[in-house]
Amino acid sequence: MDMANQLLDELAHGNFSHLTLNLSQNGREIAILQKQLTGFDDKQLETFVEQHPAMPNDTRFKIMCTSFLNYARDVDPWSAWSSSDLIFEFYQCLINCLINDNAPHIEMLIPVATRETEFIINLAGKLDSFHLQLHTRSHQFLSHISSILSRLFNSIKPPRGNASSTNIPGKQRILLYLVNKLNNIYFRIESPQLCSNIFKNFQPKSMLAHFNEYQLDQQIEYRYLLGRYYLLNSQVHNAFVQFNEAFQSLLNLPLTNQAITRNGTRILNYMIPTGLILGKMVKWGPLRPFLSQETIDNWSVLYKHVRYGNIQGVSLWLRQNERHLCARQLLIVLLEKLPMVTYRNLIKTVIKSWTTEWGQNKLPYSLIERVLQLSIGPTFEDPGAQEITIYNGIHSPKNVENVLVTLINLGLLRANCFPQLQLCVVKKTTMIQEIVPPVNERITKMFPAHSHVLW
C-alpha cells in the first residue's frame, strides 16, 4: 500500500500531479496501484481513505479520492468502453468537489478540472461515435458530460459590475471556459436550444469589465457560439455583429498559430453567408489566410448569382452544397432569406434599365413575369417537371405581385402596386437608391441589433 498511501498524502496536501484519467501521463503509477489494491473491496477502500491521517475533513473530497482509487484498481487500460463507468464516476466526483466554494485546495483543483474536462470530452465524443456498435443512445456520453458541467455552471454566480479578477473566487475565472464548453457540447449533441439558459445567465454587458479580462481566445469563442445561436433563431443582424466582432478580435492574434487560423475559418463559415443575407459584399483579399481558393471560388459563385438576381443559380448552388450547409445548420436560413435578396437585386436591375434607359416609371406585370421566368428557369409547374423539391417548390413566375408586395413590405422596394392595372409604379428618378434602398440599411433599421448584443 506504499503507493496508495503516498497518493493520498499528495492529494491531501494539494498535489494533484498524478490525479488524471490519462494513462499516457500516469500509466506507471496506475499499474503499481492496481497491483497493490487488488483484493480490496469498495468498502475497504472507503475506510482506507476515511482513516488516512492527512485527509481533509470534507466528504466530497474523500469521495473523489475513493473514486480515483476505484478507478486505479479496476481500470482496463485496453478498453475505454469497459472502464467508462469508472471514468465518468471519477470525473463527476471531481466536478462535485468544485461545487463547494470551500472545498479543500480548490485553487489547485480548478486547473485539474479543466485538464480532465478536455480529456473526458474527447473520450465521450469517441465513445458516442461508436454508439451503434456499443448499443448506446446517440450522444449519450456527451449529454452526460453536459449534465455534470451544467451543475458546476449553476454553482457559479457570474461577476457583476467592475469587479477585478483578483478579487473574485477562482471558479469565476473559469466561468467563460465552462460556458463555451457547455454551448459547444449542446451544438454537438444537436440540442442548441439548451444554449438559451446559458446565454440568459451569462450576459457580458452586465459584467463587461470582467469579461474583457478573460483570455481573448475564450471571448472570441463565446461570440462565435452566440452568433451561431442567433443565426439558428433567424436573428441575422445580431448574428453578424457577433461573428464580425469575433473575427476582428481574432485578427489581433498571431496568425502563425494554426489553431487561430482554424478558428478564423470556423467563424468565416458563418460570417460569409450571414453577410450575404445582409447584402454585404466580401473583399476576399484579407480572408485568404483562412480560406482555400476552392472555398473562395465556391462562395464567389453564390455571390454572383445573388448579385445578378439569378434565382435558378442560387437554388442550384444550395442544392449542390446541401450536405455541408446542413452539417453547419445553414441550409434553412439561406433558403428562407436569400431568395428575397436575390429578387431585390433582379428587380433593381429591371428598374435601372426601365427608368434610366427608357424613362419609364411604370413596370407592367407582364415584363416582370418574363424577367422572373428567365431568373427562375424550369419550375415544378412545367409539364416536364419530375419532382417538387425545397428548391423549386416555392418559386414561380406567376408570383409577380407576391414578390413585389413582399419587397415593399420589407422596405427593399419603394413602389406602389396596382393589381387591376397590372402595374408597379416607382418614383421618377435616376437615383436608384431612392427606389431600391441598400439591403443592409433596411435590415438594420427594421431589425436593429438588441441592446444587450452591443458590448
From Swiss-Prot:
Alphabetized Pfam families for the sequence: PCI (PF01399)
Locations listed in the record: Nucleus envelope
Taxonomic superkingdom: Eukaryota
GO cellular component: nuclear envelope; nucleus; transcription export complex 2
Family annotation (InterPro entries): Csn12-like, PCI_dom
Major localization class: nucleus
Molecular function GO terms recorded: double-stranded DNA binding; RNA binding
Statement: the UniProt record of this protein carries the keyword Nucleus: yes
Note: Present with 1140 molecules/cell in log phase SD medium.
Name of the protein: Nuclear mRNA export protein THP1
The species this protein was found in: Saccharomyces cerevisiae (strain ATCC 204508 / S288c) (Baker's yeast)
